[in-house]
């Protein structure tokens, strides 16, 4: 189908779903009649050409799954994934045969997803959008990206997503998450489902969750909340049709003198029909005056009749209906009218329109659009919606509905009584709130919003995916260093020039690599070279390691700065809120005490928990728990942000990053050294977190101008005063060939170059120090 994006460009949309919106009926020996329908399994395995031809006229393309269908659909999709996603857990009968069955179903599920891919490949054209629907197609995003990583791929889950504690029981938990994360956009009906998904990815895959989504393979997979809607105008218009008005009048005559409670559900375990009947029974028990004035009409659409569990549910429901009607009914009147069938759309709208109360008691529901349909048909009646708090619609329509816990039959009974006795003014107010929502959050808007988000997410993802940089050309680094007149070397501390920690017997204190002591001293003593150590560590740690050198130290990501011959000054804003720090220290201590060989650093503006020297798997598990705890509460309203490193979890004040402080640091250095010669060479290397990698691009903008007249402003303060200085001079005269930004051990980075480990940086620094003292002429490299 076609789609016009926000720029007015026409794009082709491929909606991929387990069910086509059509039902088929044979009209001849080789012909079929197809009608658009709201759902229903469509799996014709014969006469493929005839069916495909008829479907093509409706812009539908079938995928014939043949022998894998039962294992894929009834087996893995509905037998394993569906119960997990709806908080029901895996089947309890677990033996060797069950395990083999799981494996067979899992293979069929992957094969079916491959078959969907094959059909997409036959129909896809460059620029098309592919929108994957629901849990039946969790492998499809990965398969699509493997086929062509330029395809715009979105995935929407129509069911709930469970907590990580439930999801992690799934044997194929990691593979499914990774496959879904290949999509450019992932969307859910509610914030709870999205939060569960992000937390699950964090706990199981060890990836970082952000307010935008999940950081995975060098990019952010965007996660959004877009609750689906209906086509409200269709229902409003249907209620005004003459034949529907006639049906409404017939229903009013049939139930004359009675209040009508309506239930419309699939006969399914999650729909809570038994709980609905138990709540209704309690209401009749406690309110005898209502027994001959009320009727509950329940439409229970049959589903999966071949499954034993569903047969048991049907029998249970029928027993409840018989018991309640036997207790409270009479020859002329029954309190429950139970219908084991579906009804046509006109009759359904008539029922919606004449009902006084809609009763939805889902035990777990992705959304429940029945509640939306009821609201759309209630322009005249202003009936009351009683809605389960476990239905996704509860987060959208909760303001105008009576929310209930369906497991609490007393609460359901009380809600029925309140709804029946509710004054018209309150009913009017509640209806107005929900009607406005249903009208403005239609299915059209849902689709448009999803596709707009997908286009935006894809464009952003393209920007995030960076080219793998080249290996650092060490000979060029050395030669350019020797030819320059004013050099700036910026080094990270942890993971860059710290002592390697390969042995469990070593101490965990951060120490300067002993191989660097003489090298660093030689570089720092060179009048043409300025060395800066930029670290997230606190002032005490840097003082302890670098007190004997003539070096510039920037602690806590540049919040504090000093030359080792002077006192610390601060760049920290005066109004920075640090109230959260003391409260989190106990949290970090808790995880440190329970994770052997982990440690945490507490500084004025940040807390860092490090588990590099702990057991890796246990450390990752503890880090996931710590992250989940932090995001759930302690910093939710604090002026702080959480950042996950490879072996660390850091919480720091908002705005504390390395890149913004480089300008302040440069200004301070220029002022203190009274520089008259512009900096013409920069070597910047570190094992930096992704959030700090903008430090590499800081100098890129300066390179655009061969010689930049630079006004640098820096703030300096001691404990007694703060001072703002303004320095105006040619700070930088930096050419492309004289700038070497270098990341350590990272394939995806904003740096120009990479090296495998800190050992490479140590060796290079030694060669630079030697280049200072050599008398051999240096040949200018080719550029």
Curated annotation (Swiss-Prot):
GO MF annotation terms: alpha,alpha-trehalose-phosphate synthase (UDP-forming) activity
Full protein name: Probable alpha,alpha-trehalose-phosphate synthase [UDP-forming] 3
Region annotation (Glycosyltransferase) ranges: 11-456
Leader peptide range in chain numbering: none
Pfam families xrefs: Glyco_transf_20, Trehalose_PPase
The EC number(s) this enzyme carries: 2.4.1.15
Family label: In the N-terminal section; belongs to the glycosyltransferase 20 family.
Originating organism: Arabidopsis thaliana
SUPFAM superfamilies: HAD-like, UDP-Glycosyltransferase/glycogen phosphorylase
Catalytic activity of the protein: D-glucose 6-phosphate + UDP-alpha-D-glucose = alpha,alpha-trehalose 6-phosphate + UDP + H(+)
Keywords, sorted A to Z: Glycosyltransferase, Transferase
Gene3D superfamilies: Glycogen Phosphorylase B (3.40.50.2000)
Annotated PANTHER family: ALPHA,ALPHA-TREHALOSE-PHOSPHATE SYNTHASE [UDP-FORMING] 3-RELATED, TREHALOSE-6-PHOSPHATE SYNTHASE
InterPro entries listed in its UniProt record: Glyco_trans_20, HAD-like_sf, Trehalose_PPase
GO BP field: trehalose biosynthetic process
Root EC class: transferase
């Amino acid at each position: 189908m076609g789609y016009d994006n926000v720029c007015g460009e026409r794009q082709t949309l491929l909606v991929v779903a387990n069910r086509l919106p059509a039902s088929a009926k044979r009209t001849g020996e080789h012909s079929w009649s197809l009608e658009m329908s709201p759902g229903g399994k469509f799996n014709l395995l014969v006469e493929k050409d005839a069916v495909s031809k008829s479907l093509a006229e409706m812009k539908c393309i079938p995928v014939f799954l043949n022998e894998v269908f039962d294992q894929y659909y009834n087996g893995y999709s509905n037998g394993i994934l569906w119960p997990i996603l709806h908080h029901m857990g895996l089947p309890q009968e677990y033996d060797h045969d069950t395990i083999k069955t799981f494996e067979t179903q899992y293979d069929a599920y992957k094969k079916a997803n491959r078959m969907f891919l094959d059909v997409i490949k036959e129909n896809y054209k460059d620029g098309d959008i592919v929108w994957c629907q629901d849990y039946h197609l969790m492998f499809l995003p990965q398969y699509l990206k493997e086929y062509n990583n330029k395809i715009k791929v979105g995935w929407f889950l129509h069911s709930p997503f469970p907590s990580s504690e439930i999801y992690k029981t799934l044997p194929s938990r990691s593979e499914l998450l990774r496959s879904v994360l290949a999509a450019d956009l992932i969307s859910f009906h509610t914030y709870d489902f999205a939060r569960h998904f992000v937390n699950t990815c964090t706990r199981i895959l060890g990836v970082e969750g952000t307010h935008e989504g999940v950081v995975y393979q060098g990019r952010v997979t965007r996660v959004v909340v877009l609750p689906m809607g209906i086509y409200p105008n269709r229902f409003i218009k249907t209620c005004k049709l003459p034949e529907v008005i006639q049906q409404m009048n017939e229903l009013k005559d049939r139930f004359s003198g009675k209040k009508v409670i309506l239930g419309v559900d699939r006969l399914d375990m999650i729909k809570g029909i038994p709980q609905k009947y138990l709540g209704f029974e309690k209401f009749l028990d406690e309110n005898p005056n209502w027994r001959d004035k009320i009727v509950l009409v329940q439409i229970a659409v049959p589903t999966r009749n071949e499954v034993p569990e569903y047969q048991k549910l049907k029998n249970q429901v029928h027993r409840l209906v018989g018991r309640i009607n036997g207790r409270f009914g009479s020859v002329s009147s029954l309190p429950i009218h139970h219908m084991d069938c579906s009804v046509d759309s006109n009759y359904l709208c008539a029922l919606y329109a004449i009902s006084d109360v809609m009763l939805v008691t889902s035990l777990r529901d992705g959304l429940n659009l029945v509640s939306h349909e009821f609201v759309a048909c209630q322009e005249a009646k202003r009936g009351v919606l009683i809605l389960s708090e476990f239905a996704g619609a509860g987060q959208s329509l909760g303001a105008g509905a009576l929310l209930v816990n369906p497991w609490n039959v007393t609460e359901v009974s009380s809600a029925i009584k309140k709804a029946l006795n509710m004054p018209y003014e309150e009913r009017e107010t509640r209806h107005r709130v929900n009607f406005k929502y249903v009208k403005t959050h239609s299915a059209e808007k849902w689709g448009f919003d999803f596709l707009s988000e997908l286009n935006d997410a894809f464009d952003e993802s393209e920007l995030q995916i960076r080219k793998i940089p080249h290996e650092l050309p060490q000979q060029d680094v050395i030669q350019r260093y020797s030819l320059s007149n004013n050099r700036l070397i910026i080094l990270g501390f942890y993971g860059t020039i710290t002592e390697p920690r390969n042995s469990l017997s070593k101490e965990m204190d951060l120490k300067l690599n002993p191989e660097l002591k003489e090298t660093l001293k030689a570089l720092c003593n060179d009048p043409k070279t300025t060395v800066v150590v930029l670290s997230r560590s606190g002032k005490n740690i840097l003082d302890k390691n670098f007190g004997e050198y003539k070096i510039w130290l920037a602690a806590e990501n540049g919040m504090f700065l000093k030359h080792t011959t002077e006192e610390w000054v601060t760049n920290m804003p005066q109004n920075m809120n640090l109230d959260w720090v003391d409260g989190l220290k106990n949290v970090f201590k808790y995880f440190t005490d329970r994770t052997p060989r982990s440690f945490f650093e507490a500084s004025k503006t940040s807390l860092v928990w490090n588990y590099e020297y702990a057991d890796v798997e246990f450390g990752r598990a503890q880090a996931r728990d710590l992250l989940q705890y932090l995001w759930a509460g302690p910093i939710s309203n604090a002026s702080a942000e959480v950042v996950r490193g490879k072996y660390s979890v850091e919480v720091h004040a908002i705005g504390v990053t390395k890149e913004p402080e480089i300008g302040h640091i440069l200004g301070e250095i220029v002022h203190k050294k009274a520089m008259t010669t512009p900096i013409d060479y920069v070597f910047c290397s570190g094992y930096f977190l992704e959030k700090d990698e903008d430090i590499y691009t800081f100098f890129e903008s300066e390179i655009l101008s061969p010689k930049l007249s630079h006004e640098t402003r820096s703030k300096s303060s001691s404990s007694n005063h703060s001072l703002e200085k303004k320095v105006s001079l040619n700070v930088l005269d930096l050419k492309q060939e004289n700038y070497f930004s270098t990341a350590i051990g990272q394939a995806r980075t904003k740096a120009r170059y990479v090296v495998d480990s800190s050992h490479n940086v140590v060796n290079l620094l030694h060669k630079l120090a030697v280049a200072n003292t050599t008398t051999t002429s240096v040949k200018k490299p080719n550029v």
